[in-house]
Amino acid sequence: MIASPDFVPLTPDEYLKHEAQSLEKHEYRDGDVYAMAGAMDEHVTIAGNLFAELRQFLRGSGCRVYISDMKARVESINRFFYPDVMVTCDPQDQETAAYKRFPKLIVEVLSESTEAYDRGDKFADYRQLESLQEYVLVSAKRK
């Protein structure tokens, strides 16, 4: 998303309200909102397969698995992301339906347009989550 000269940063609450009504997904970084591109077939298939395997593996554990329509909130640095797959086991995450604050696992399926960001700035942002134990990057190129 290209910011206009008249752009006014959004508060997290304004972002969540806008996102609930939007037809497309946006990431939020300290007041700035960025539209996300749609994913390709291979990307969606990999994320879906990981979701299905993790859901089956974690059944009955109290953990929940979410796919790319659930936001992860990094509250300490004022960020919202849409991970491809996310696992949370913290009961506090059941208090909010629009986002999760305590993921243990985040998986990103790499694409050419996002790989550098997923490995760099986004990873640095995710490291601010005290609950995060694993950050997994999956290449759609390798077989």
Question: Where in this protein do the model-derived segments appear?
Answer:
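Gly/Pro/Ser/Thr-rich low-complexity, intrinsically disordered segments predominantly at protein N-termini
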Residues: 1-143
